[in-house]
Amino acid sequence: MSARPFSTPFDRERRVRSTLKKVFGFDSFKTPLQESAIMAVVKGDKDVFVCMPTGAGKSLCYQLPAVLAKGITIVVSPLIALIQDQVDHLLALKVQVSSLNSKLSVQERKELLSDLERDKPRTKLLYITPEMAASASFQPTLNSLLSRNLLSYLVVDEAHCVSQWGHDFRPDYLRLGALRSRLAHAPCVALTATATPQVQEDVFAALHLKQPVASFKTPCFRANLFYDVQFKELIPDVYGNLRDFCLKALGQKADNGSSSGCGIVYCRTREACEQLAIELSSRGVNAKAYHAGLKASERTQVQNEWMEEKVPVIVATISFGMGVDKANVRFVAHWNIAKSMAGYYQESGRAGRDGKPSWCRLYYSRNDRDQVSFLIRKELAKLQEKRGNKPSDKATLLAFDALVTFCEEVGCRHAAIAKYFGDAPPACAKGCDCCQSPAAIRKKLDALEHSSSWGKTCIGPSQGDGFDPELYEGGRRGYGGFSRYDEGSGGSGDEGRDEAHKREWNLFYQRQMSLRKGKEAKPEEFTPPGEDCPLRDASSRKIPKLTVKAREHCLRLLEEALNSNHQAAGSTHGADLQAKAVELEHETFRSAKMVNLYKASVLKKVAEIHKASKDGQLYDMESSTKSCGAIAELLEPSDYDIPPTSHLYSLKPKRVGAGFSKGPCPFQTATELLGKSQTEKLAPEAALESEQEPSGWVCDPQDGDRSKPCLGYQEEAPGSRTNCGDPSPEKRTKGSSQGSAKARASKRQQLLATAARKDSQSITRFLRQRTECPPPAASVPSSEDASPCGDVPGKCTEEVGAQGHLVAVFQTECPRERLSTCSLEDQSLPKGQPSPLKETQAEKRPRPQQESQEKRAQKRLRPSTNSSALASDPSTENRVAREPCQLSAPGISLKEAADIVVRYLTPFYKEGRFISKDLFKGFARHLSHLLAQKLSPGRSVKEEAQSLIKQFFHNRARCESEADWHGLCGPQR
């Protein structure tokens, strides 16, 4: 069908202007060049090539003539999304337009094809992709239209895709030349926004455009766009810089809170889009990500919100923007360098289509540049392996190098773009950063050259011989330097071998990495239990690598086994089987230390239950629970048996203050020597009694008779408790099993205990007379934690000899008999703090009692002069008697005190209560020395440390200088 339905030029111009007003709603054309191009297409006697910047009105150059023509115009466009935008726009103008693509439903496709089969189709424009144009399914429709002479125009949008010299080459566009040859009688219109002279020649040749071609090309210069380049290496906060740029470009917000425009930020990767959208949103700029990784519905929603300006900034990959008709885009920012100058110009040109001032910024960094360069070369290498080398391969590198030059050289940005596209240098009039402040740009580039991140490496080729004088022996072995003379002749053969070796190594490396990918250990992630989890201590991570899911599975096994057992035994009472299963599982969990042992224990219990079911017996839960608990206690090591590394320092001989002995008890009396001599006299008799009653001096926690002697004391005041501290049954069981063997191992301890049971040394004579003098309130312990070691000596104020003898007995026996003496673990030490006395026993170190008689006598005679003072001062007596059974001994090491201080002080440091780490260390050092020097009576090191820290921060928000703790006094004794 003829595309020239008008008889005269005047009639043609009148119809064009009338359609422009009635259909498209414009009173006049945007530019004279646009009007000339439309008139040439409407005339229809030549093929037309149109090159106009984005937003200059290219689409109208073929849409208006298509509406005036009587036939159908086929429009080839590269993207379905771009096609859909054009179709929606024309449908809003009530233009009959359709798209034939793979996303149509069966019904829509059927309706479209039936319309095209009519004698006079209603469709004026038919949009297709180049793939559809070459497909076999489209050929019958095309042949039908050709045979009926219903084709008015063939329009190729984004015609630069046909050129291998272009920035967006698509091989399917090359097939359009054959389609153009079949439509020889219909004019062809090729349109693009970017075309270098080389690309323009390729378009003419590939599309078989008839000469002479009516060419309409607008200069690429756009005066309303301001171009600038920012260097990431010189910006302390790049996200903040981008935020400021966005807010400045968007301008003041309207009364309803919306911005007067919108903006686009382009990123190279999907991950960068997501990250940048989050960073901008957190800094007060509402932004959303748009990329191919999102679902189609999500992408549509984000695009619609941006079009409606609900979201002012969209962070997208380069797939966004083609065909998006939005005039008030106030800025376009590139977070990474683009792949070509043409691509950058096309993407940045989406700003300011309304002619108002807009901004285009490129964030440039050498790292981004190297990454993009690597990807370009990698893509070229793949293509060359398939099809060989082509001259057009250089075009891709040249296009990228042009953009690198655009960023790294001082010069007008608009002039650099115009030079690339073959246009004359425009009158910039301070339309870019270089023309506005060239000195500042030079200063930035100089700073980049001297920055460490800029480095020495470059993209350009190396020297011809490959010898670098700054590298050792000129660089790579065999390629330069003196080593070159030691090997055979070089040349192209050596280079070929090097390349082959490099490829072989790369393949080997990739294979090895692929093998290791599946073997990488994944970090353990503990899944917390749900709200309805029936397990006890479900959130406990006592057993490593044991998940809650595995424990629940084991619980189900136990519950099912118990259920079958009840059915097999014919039990009728409604016992809660789940509760029993939970108890069994928890006991197994407590007794096991490893996942395999836990699972084995569960399976063993299941087997026992099944065995009971097979015998027709009801499974005995109580005996199983007791045995499991006993096993748990036997297998579970005490917190005090294996001291942490920091407490091993306590095993070393410690330096103590003047006047203190080196033994476990600092106070020794002269009466201890008397006690020793009496013990030696009674040794034969004690040995005989020890044979008859070998365990009478050991407290038996299982024995119900509480009047049995403990620690060698034969009697006790009525109502008093024999076992010190009254530990729990579990601890008593554990203590008796561990302590009896240790106690029997020492014959000397048996002798001393037997001697203590003699009437001449009975403690009852001291206890009978102390009711006359009540003890001080501070020294009275609670009824539950009553201890002979803490009560008896503190209340007795008899003669000096008796008191001294009592102290001697305690000094001899308390440090040695851990299980039978005061419960240090329960009274003085919090859980997890090992006893220094027990540490001395655990390690086979020389004991003070094993020293020579002369040294022991000398040490005991030193404090003996103060025995009268001890007898006359009740508080002193109380302290002397209690201190061997508590941690708060003046001989605590500085290392132990420092460990405790750091442990309790660290949370305050993490909360920012110290302005510096040095100040934190200084205060910890000061506090450790205070604790090591003296302690309050009856308080442990941990209690004293907590008290001092609480006192220090009571009226102080932060510790700001060393002067803050100068007034902090240590504990007073």
Curated annotation (Swiss-Prot):
Enzyme class: isomerase
GO molecular function: 3'-5' DNA helicase activity; ATP binding; ATP hydrolysis activity; DNA binding; DNA helicase activity; four-way junction helicase activity; helicase activity; metal ion binding
Residue ranges constituting the Helicase C-terminal domain according to the UniProt record: 241-398
Keywords attached to this entry: ATP-binding, Cell cycle, Cell division, DNA damage, DNA repair, DNA replication, DNA-binding, Helicase, Hydrolase, Isomerase, Metal-binding, Mitosis, Nucleotide-binding, Nucleus, Phosphoprotein, Zinc
Manner of cofactor binding, per the entry note: Binds a Zn(2+) ion per subunit.
Chief location category: nucleus
Modification after translation (UniProt): Phosphorylated by CDK1 at Ser-728; this phosphorylation is required for RECQL5-mediated disruption of RAD51 filaments on stalled replication forks.
Keyword DNA damage in record: yes
Helicase ATP-binding domain location: 39-213
InterPro entries: DEAD/DEAH_box_helicase_dom, DNA/RNA_helicase_DEAH_CS, DNA_helicase_ATP-dep_RecQ, Helicase_ATP-bd, Helicase_C-like, P-loop_NTPase, RECQ5, RecQ_Zn-bd
UniProt binding sites for ATP: 52-59
PTM sites of type Phosphothreonine: 527
Pfam families: DEAD, Helicase_C, RecQ5, RecQ_Zn_bind, SRI
Cell location: Nucleus, Nucleoplasm
Substrates-to-products reaction catalysed: Couples ATP hydrolysis with the unwinding of duplex DNA by translocating in the 3'-5' direction; ATP + H2O = ADP + phosphate + H(+)
Region Interaction with POLR2A, residue ranges: 491-621
Stretches the record annotates as Disordered: 518-538, 679-795, 822-884
Biased composition (Basic and acidic residues): 840-856
Gene Ontology CC terms, in alphabetical order: chromosome; cytoplasm; nucleoplasm; nucleus; replication fork; transcription preinitiation complex
SMART domains in the record: DEXDc, HELICc
Residues the record lists as Phosphoserine modifications: 489, 492, 728
Cofactor(s) needed: Zn(2+)
Function noted in UniProt: DNA helicase that plays an important role in DNA replication, transcription and repair. Binds to the RNA polymerase II subunit POLR2A during transcription elongation and suppresses transcription-associated genomic instability. Also associates with POLR1A and enforces the stability of ribosomal DNA arrays. Plays an important role in mitotic chromosome separation after cross-over events and cell cycle progress. Mechanistically, removes RAD51 filaments protecting stalled replication forks at common fragile sites and stimulates MUS81-EME1 endonuclease leading to mitotic DNA synthesis.
Protein name: ATP-dependent DNA helicase Q5
